[in-house]
Amino acid sequence: VFSHYGPYEFMMKDENAKRMGIPVPLFNLVYHDCFILPWPMDKKQEDYMLYALLNGGISYVVRNAPYDNVDGNFGSDGLSIEDRITRANIVLDFYQRIKNEEMVEHKIINDHVQQATFSNNITIEINTKENTYTIL
């Protein structure tokens, strides 16, 4: 199944709006191996690419909302099209490694660090404070 997209609730609001809880990949723990879900790739204070990786999803190169200031469209993050393609390829390369695998485990290490492990023993760790990821 291919979907338009299914971002976390906070991705649809201004990045400075108050968040509810810690976003975790519960949906993808169940459906990752049978559902293709593109993710927003905005990079402002926080890098949304990290959530595409954590969820084992694919990326949008450019995602335009129908109107300004709605549906996650709160101005440009300043990335060039070349940077967007480079970032999309990072997500695509990871997706190629885990696309047919179940997500078998998710861990919250602390408020900013999470891990997801797939059935081929590939683990992705994201750090939303440092805006980094590691493939373990």
Residues covered by each model-derived region:
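Active-site-proximal substrate-binding groove within the catalytic cores of carbohydrate-active enzymes
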Residues: 1-136
